[in-house]
């Protein structure tokens, strides 16, 4: 199978917001909120985009949190201002470093987006560079476009049918670099993303928040293009490509099985109200479904054993779709009896529906008013998969991917009328020439020469694109300790806590630790506490950061020895940690252990 892979790599810039003069960082919390309901509109040719149509069907409301780095432009109550010149110059500089042709005029377009992530219902985007390329270990990779666009609002939470967004991220300049499908495999994709990342980050104008770098992976095995949006970590690129390969291979196997039995039948799939069949059920999910609207079931002809059977997981495809409409109570016959349903209840359901041996049954808790819409959506999705048209937009979920929405098309683009065309003149070109991106090798060598860290640590820092974070941390702690924080301590804490802390907070903690004269062990303890609490101020007041004195350490050691524990030089540190959560210097603890042990031996 001919696999094609391409990337769209997005980098936020720290230049100031793109269409107003607000800063990219906020210094206070919520100022106010307002609500909107977005409605679909046709393109200039009169067509309606499939992705926009899908979002419209979800009929959601949106609430926006106003922050101190947002204004009337983000609220869509005032026209956009002239685009930030420094952001444009940075995009031109990056385009040149990627061997692109620079456009003569920058013309903004509107891209319809009605998922609530922009108050206007569209995103402004413009092409800056075209027809570039980068060299890689597996040959050249063509760069199709470099765009400068506004970032979307940041999703905070979903409450029922309402989505809450913050305006703090809306309007931040975003460089989007799109490659042609020249990437040969998942490891090559990681290499390409890194190579592009070094160039953008080394401009000095890239933002370094948790969500400042995002990759979209375009993947095809001949069954249509799948766009996996919002991959935040480089290593996750490898994971989602591997998963998507396996997913599509397994869907092919499921489809072949369904077709060998005669295929899917639209007439048979008719969601019927089966609430009365479960009037006395002990299943909490079914009871809850009946109370909230009703339980409906339908036959999926010839699909038995394809919904959840080893690697065949068509049921997940259905569940992902239904979940996107805010519906959670979905069950199917490949996992029944289960969920508190008895064998007798399941058999009664099958008899009522007239289930055949090769048929599957779908059971869903849903309000009656949404039944027909969900029924059509489910059937259309299954039919699309059976035709092996797998094109759609998906999102990362750990090492897997989940359905987000149909693939958008050209019908969502139309001209921007509020922003004049920008001529790329000598002034912009001169500004861009003062911004000098560097290669990976240059960045690594500079870290080794300037800070005296090992080449291995320098390569990790460069490859993970945390160079600026390292430099900022190294202002407050010794360079080797700064490298250790980013290469060992932070990755370990992220694995253990499943949390990602913004580098700005880590830098602030290091700054405060210098003021408080923390030693290495107090700082490392403070970092652990930061991953518990998120807030730097509350971390510094934690009693665990009060370092144990020599006498306190000796007292703990005496207690351990008197209890009869077999304390040795290899075990004493762990034994002390069992007795106290407070921080201590292991070297001092070893000295105290030897002193106490020797004194005991005298007697």
From Swiss-Prot:
Entry function: Allows the formation of correctly charged Gln-tRNA(Gln) through the transamidation of misacylated Glu-tRNA(Gln) in organisms which lack glutaminyl-tRNA synthetase. The reaction takes place in the presence of glutamine and ATP through an activated gamma-phospho-Glu-tRNA(Gln). The GatDE system is specific for glutamate and does not act on aspartate.
A Pfam family assignment: GatB_N
Domain of life: Archaea
NCBIfam families: gatE_arch, PRK04028.1
GO molecular function: aminoacyl-tRNA ligase activity; ATP binding; glutaminyl-tRNA synthase (glutamine-hydrolyzing) activity
Name this polypeptide is given: Glutamyl-tRNA(Gln) amidotransferase subunit E
This enzyme's EC code(s): 6.3.5.-
Ranges that cross the membrane: none
Catalytic activity: L-glutamyl-tRNA(Gln) + L-glutamine + ATP + H2O = L-glutaminyl-tRNA(Gln) + L-glutamate + ADP + phosphate + H(+)
Intrachain S-S bonds: none
Organism: Thermoplasma acidophilum (strain ATCC 25905 / DSM 1728 / JCM 9062 / NBRC 15155 / AMRC-C165)
InterPro entries in alphabetical order: Asn/Gln-tRNA_amidoTrfase_suB/E (IPR017959), Asn/Gln-tRNA_Trfase_suB/E_cat (IPR006075), GAD-like_sf (IPR004115), GatE (IPR004414), Gln-tRNA_amidoTrfase_suB_CS (IPR017958), Gln_synth/guanido_kin_cat_dom (IPR014746)
